[in-house]
Structure formats: structure tokens, C-alpha cells
UniProtKB/Swiss-Prot annotation:
Gene Ontology MF terms: phosphatidate cytidylyltransferase activity
Record keyword Nucleotidyltransferase present: yes
EC number(s) reported in the record: 2.7.7.41
Required cofactor names: Mg(2+)
Location(s) in or outside the cell: Mitochondrion inner membrane
Lineage: Eukaryota, Metazoa, Chordata, Craniata, Vertebrata
Membrane disposition: Peripheral membrane protein
Name of the protein in question: Phosphatidate cytidylyltransferase, mitochondrial
A Gene Ontology cellular-component term: mitochondrial inner membrane
Organism for this UniProt entry: Xenopus laevis
Top enzyme category: transferase
Catalysed conversion reaction: a 1,2-diacyl-sn-glycero-3-phosphate + CTP + H(+) = a CDP-1,2-diacyl-sn-glycerol + diphosphate
Length: 338
């Protein structure tokens, strides 16, 4: 999954990683500080905050070591100790603990810590679609443990993204339309897209980075029995028959299937999941059902994770971070009017 990124940035990412405890199963960096987005110049990219995620097997031990090495990164929660920090990480929001606006090696960074098990559950089942959603889009993998379960879960997450996108697209579409749909999956229902994000965020992510998306999805598309991938023309065709859509629905992550079931099945009926998904496969409004089910996952996790961020970052940093996001939103609105 490692992808080429902006020229000359790989060494700095590895240097930054060296400032942290090294017992990490997966570390990656992502976002506009790594992959150039539409409307950004080279200087803009150099000045952007860098975003990282670290997956660790034992968060208590990792936070213990990180507080020793990087005590200033933490809010007042450091005084409660690593067990309380881990409890906040695991029991609230999307299971991720973020330290933000951290000066490191001449750059400002934000990094999230997630347990390896929480990451696996999100990749496989889309419990929150928080980290799984980030991994639908190009990222720069900095370290990845040789672990068959993790490798399989990362691939499963990409296949799930394709199936969900297929169900919301027409029978024939361009590669760019596919990647726009995939990139938007984890923003469906995210309240930050209403308040605090660039209104053209999904378009800006995809437009300059189609080759990076191709590196993630081309091999899976070629191997997909329900799709015809015409790489030379940049087109994709999918099976939109009820049988084809049923297979795609059955391959969706468990949490998304549960949300679909809750939307479609009247209370008290208690039908089998297979029966409900067969009904959805024949529904002309199948795509809107998928969209609503995604909203339910993302809305809940984005709200609770953002609320947790006020505690983990502290009030001062939360205000600074929110101000930056609001500035981006207002700038995109001004661009839209011009």
C-alpha cells in the first residue's frame, strides 16, 4: 500500500517517526501535507500540518513511554496517567487519541494513537469508519508489521469501499467518478463537512491524485467478478442486476449491513439479514439506502470523536485547530462565489 508522494518528503516523515516509541504495528501519514490537493502550491504544502496515525498493540505501555519522551504533547490528561489516557482513547469517540498542533522536527504535526485491535475491527467491520475511511484514500505507509491479519484487513477495507461505491453509482462510470464516490464515503454524515471543512474537499483530494487511487484499486478492480475495468479508457462497468447488487450487499462490512437492516426492516419483524438485503438489492432506491446507512456510522463517530478532541487537545489547542478549519471553509466558500 506504500505510494509515491511529494518529492523529498519521505526522509522527513521517517525522522518524525523516530521521535516516538517504536513499538508500532502500523504508522502512516496522510492528508494535504503529504498529497498535493487541487488549489495548493508547493509552498502551501510545505506549511501545512502533517497528520499521522500510529496503531499500537499495547496503548498503556506506548503512552507510558511517549509521556516520558514527549510529555509536552499531551493536555492535562497526562497528569491522570497512561491508564486514564488509554481509557479515554478506547472508550470514547472512534477509539483514537489525538495530540494536535505539536511542533516536531521543524513542522507542526497531529498524531492519532489507536489500538491495533480497534484498527482491525474498523477495517473489517466499519464500526466507526474513522481510520478505515482514511485508508480508503492514498496514504504514505511509514512502517507496517509483517502481519497476515493486518495485511488482509487492509485489503478487505479497500474491497468494501469498492462494493459500497458500486452500489451508489450507475452501471457505467469513469474512474474519477468512482474515486470521488470512494473518497466521499467517510465524509457522508460528517458534521465537520458542514462546519469547518473546505467545501470542495473530496474533489480536491481526488483530482490531482487519480494515479495514487489507481495504485490502491486497479488490481482489485481487475480481479472483481462483478466489474469490467477498462483501464485504457478510464471506465468501469458494474453488474446492476438484483443478483449482482445482492452479492455486493452481502460483501459489505457488518456494521453497514446492520444499519441497512435497521433502516429497511420494520420493528418487530426480525427477518434474516439475507432476506432484507435481497429486498434492498431489488429496490430502485438502493443507493439512497446505502447513503443513509453510511450517514448513521459517520455522523455518530465524527461527533463523538470531535467532542473527545476538546479533552485530548485541551481548550487552547482546540480553539486554534478549529480556527484553522473554519478559515479553510470560508476560503473555499469565497472561491465558490468568485
Amino acid at each position: 500500500m506504500s505510494l509515491p508522494v511529494l518529492q523529498g518528503t519521505g526522509f522527513q516523515f521517517r525522522r518524525i517517526l523516530s521521535f516516538f516509541p517504536q513499538d508500532i504495528s502500523l504508522a502512516f501519514t496522510y492528508g494535504s501535507g503529504v498529497f498535493r490537493q487541487a488549489g495548493s502550491s508547493h509552498n502551501d504544502v510545505r506549511n501545512k500540518m502533517l497528520d499521522f496515525v500510529f496503531a499500537v498493540d499495547d496503548p498503556v505501555t506506548w503512552h507510558t513511554m511517549n509521556i516520558i519522551q514527549n510529555r509536552s504533547h499531551y493536555s492535562f490528561l497526562k497528569f491522570l496517567g497512561p491508564k486514564h489516557i488509554t481509557a479515554v482513547q478506547n472508550n470514547y469517540g472512534a477509539g483514537v487519541y489525538y495530540n494536535t498542533l505539536v511542533p516536531c522536527d521543524g513542522r507542526l504535526i497531529k498524531y492519532g494513537v489507536v489500538s491495533t485491535e480497534t484498527l482491525l475491527q474498523d477495517l473489517l467491520h466499519w464500526r466507526t469508519l474513522y481510520i478505515a475511511g482514511r485508508l480508503h484514500k492514498p496514504v504514505k505507509i511509514l512502517t507496517q508489521r509483517d502481519d497476515g491479519r493486518l495485511k488482509s484487513a487492509l485489503t478487505s477495507n479497500l474491497k468494501s469501499a469498492l462494493n459500497a461505491a458500486f452500489l451508489m453509482l450507475p452501471e457505467s462510470f469513469s474512474e474519477e467518478e468512482l474515486y470521488l464516490q470512494i473518497a466521499g464515503l467517510s465524509y457522508a454524515g460528517d458534521f465537520r463537512m458542514i462546519i469547518g471543512e473546505d467545501k470542495d474537499k473530496v474533489l480536491n483530494i481526488v483530482k490531482p491524485n487519480v494515479p495514487h487511487f489507481q495504485k490502491l484499486y486497479a488490481a482489485i478492480l481487475l480481479d472483481c467478478p462483478l466489474a469490467v475495468y477498462k483501464a485504457q479508457q478510464g471506465r468501469v462497468e458494474v453488474d446492476k442486476s438484483p443478483e449482482g447488487q445482492y452479492q455486493q450487499l452481502m460483501a459489505l462490512p457488518k456494521k453497514l449491513q446492520q444499519n441497512i437492516t435497521a433502516l429497511v426492516d420494520p420493528p418487530g419483524k426480525n427477518r434474516d439479514v439475507e432476506e432484507i438485503l435481497l429486498q434492498v438489492a431489488q429496490d430502485p432506491d438502493c443507493s439512497s439506502v446505502i447513503q443513509q446507512a453510511l450517514y448513521g456510522i459517520v455522523r455518530s463517530s465524527s461527533l463523538s470523536q470531535s467532542a473527545k478532541g476538546i479533552v485530548t487537545a485541551g481548550v487552547k489547542k482546540s480553539v486554534q485547530y478549529s480556527s484553522k478549519k473554519l478559515y479553510k471553509m470560508l476560503r473555499s466558500l469565497r472561491r465558490g462565489k468568485s
